[in-house]
């Protein structure tokens, strides 16, 4: 089911149509709005320039989160492999 949600970003209203929940849509819009406002507060920029810089900041955060997720997946895999080795060793020792 498609949800239609009106959000305000940088003072402009947008109608977003998405299968995501209204709460999720609003949360995303708020994140974008807050990032644009932070960029504008740091430097006097046009809405377009502030939007581009905010998008760059969000993209950087996204890629850092992906990298962190990849690192966690590798750690989990390593722990699972170590767990398997330790279980095998434990079983071997129990058979003695």
What are these regions (language model features)?
Residues 33, 84-87:
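Structural signal for well-ordered, non-membrane alpha-helices
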Residues 2, 93-96:
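Short hydrophobic/aromatic patches at helix-to-coil boundaries
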Residues 20, 78-81:
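DHp/HisKA dimerization-phosphoacceptor four-helix bundle of two-component histidine kinases
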Residues 42-54, 58-61, 65-68, 72-75, ...:
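Heptad-repeat coiled-coil/leucine-zipper oligomerization helices
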Residues 2-50, 56:
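Short, positively charged
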């Amino acid at each position: 089911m498609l949800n239609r949600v009106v959000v305000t970003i940088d003072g402009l209203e947008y109608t977003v149509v998405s299968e995501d929940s209204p709460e999720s849509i609003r949360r995303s819009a708020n994140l974008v709005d807050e990032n644009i406002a932070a960029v504008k507060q740091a430097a006097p920029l046009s809405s377009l320039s502030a939007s581009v810089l905010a998008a760059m900041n969000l993209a950087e955060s996204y890629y850092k989160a992906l990298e962190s997720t990849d690192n966690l997946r590798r750690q989990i895999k390593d722990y699972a492999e170590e767990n398997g080795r330790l279980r095998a060793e434990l079983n071997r020792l129990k058979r003695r």
